């Protein structure tokens, strides 16, 4: 639902050429394709397993005639410069940093192009020390929405619209499936120390979310180049 809402906030005509960077298994790419039935979408991820899963998803949805998954670097996507109406990135821009990513992606946008991305943000000025310390260890660059807008401006972009995702979106699309994967991992590899460490870290993240979801969220930002 939040993907569709973000699409509705993209200014101008419906984008025809769309680039989804850090696409993962392609769930939001498929949602994009539904919201933009005329668009041709290139979904990019650095992990072969993600590209394969996304490709299977597109075939199953019957959209593989206009939506393709390819392996590539989100900092240097495998598309022609000045060719994209919309660059999309959910839960992945942190790999580059907001300002750095926007500067890297700008050459691939058409003059009227738009970038839409999600970024974790604080929802309060003084979060509890426990969750503050956890986030600073996981992602030291986390800031509030005003801080993200400043990072956008530093890249010579302007924020057209933004909104925070509700806690339900985190659970339905991220932590709920994660909980299922943890259970499957523990069942499949009960004595594997690496698997156990991964599962324990993921369980800790879920616990923090359940206790502190009023302190932080992901927010969507829809931005355009200033000139």
Identify the residue ranges that each predicted region occupies.
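Conserved alpha-helix/loop element of class I SAM-dependent methyltransferases that forms part
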Residues: 1-14
């Amino acid at each position: 639902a939040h993907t569709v809402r973000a699409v509705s906030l993209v200014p101008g005509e419906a984008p025809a050429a769309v680039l989804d960077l850090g696409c993962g298994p392609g769930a939001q790419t498929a949602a994009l394709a539904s919201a933009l039935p005329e668009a041709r979408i290139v979904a990019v991820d650095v992990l072969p397993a993600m590209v394969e899963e996304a490709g299977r998803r597109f075939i199953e949805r019957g959209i593989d005639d206009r939506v393709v998954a390819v392996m590539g670097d989100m900092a240097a996507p495998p598309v022609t410069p000045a060719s994209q109406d919309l660059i999309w990135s959910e839960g992945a821009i942190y790999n580059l940093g907001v300002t750095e990513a926007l500067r890297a992606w700008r050459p691939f946008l058409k003059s009227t192009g738009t970038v839409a991305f999600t970024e974790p943000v604080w929802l309060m000025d003084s979060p509890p020390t426990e969750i503050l310390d956890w986030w600073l260890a996981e992602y030291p660059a986390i800031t509030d929405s005003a801080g993200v807008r400043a990072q956008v401006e530093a890249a010579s972009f302007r924020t057209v619209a933004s909104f925070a995702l509700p806690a339900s979106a985190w659970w339905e699309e991220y932590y709920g499936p994660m909980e299922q994967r943890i259970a499957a991992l523990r069942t499949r590899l009960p004595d594997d120390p690496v698997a156990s460490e991964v599962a324990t870290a993921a369980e800790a993240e879920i616990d923090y979310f359940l206790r502190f979801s009023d302190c932080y969220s992901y927010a969507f930002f829809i931005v355009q180049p200033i000139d």
